[in-house]
Amino acid sequence: EISACLVGSEMCIRDRFLTEVKKMQKKIALINDVTGFGRCSIAVMAPIVSAMKIQAVTVPTAILSAHTQFPTFYFDDYTDKMEDYIQTYKELNLEFDAISTGFLGSERQVEIVTDFIKYFKNDRNFVIVDPVMGDYGRLYQTYNKAMCNRMKELVKYADIITPNLTELTTLLDLPYPDHTVTIEELKKMCIALAAQGPKHIVVTGIRFNKTQIANFIYNKDEDFQMVMADRIGGDRSGTGDVIASVIAGMYMNGHSFYESVKKAAAYVSKCISYCEENKVPEYWGLCFEMYLKDLVDEC
């Protein structure tokens, strides 16, 4: 009898916990690696969405002491642990207001993430995919033909996608342009990608001219828009993660997709300017911590 009471009490506590969890502030699942030094992936995404009053729930794909641009780093592939890790969230009946995916290192990881989205996706949340595949016309070493095909399957579940030009052309099986891409070309490519599933697309980091970078925005069945930013310094690790997390946070807090991209571009530009002025090495990433208050003010 005493045992039965204890079991009943535990079930009651569990039920209360689940009820309270569902009442809490918005939650986003961040599926990405955890890197100790270098300001990238979950290490930048979690504090950014937290500053925007959103609870970050992490799903690690790998653990690194520093990102791969450093001459030495510790790496622990988390693929074989991901399903057991995710099972806890299923047993707790967690619900997410958004799901964000970043760099995925293998076909198996893409399969696991696709299954995660299928399980947790509903008509009240959205999925944002940053298809980290390559840049400047070259794919990363892990992205062979089979891996690219897996990523194309994942894109079908995205509501928002944030490719650069290399990733956009790869997802559409098009050659990387050997000229400055035109607005008409971008329109055609975005329409073609939207036909695969995404409602909102922003093609990031387009080298528009010698002094500006363009972010080309497409909302399905609506007009195209552009957000311009000054070209400052070189490429910095984690920039795409910062952009994706600011867009996700803004969009979760009720801002339009255009306003979300505009804020992300302005925030990144401000962080880059600080880094350049203070001679922060590019592989140390963005000093995003300096301007988190700018994001708090948007909530």
Task: Give the ranges of each region predicted by the language model.
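Short, small-residue alpha-helix embedded
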Residues: 170, 234-257, 261
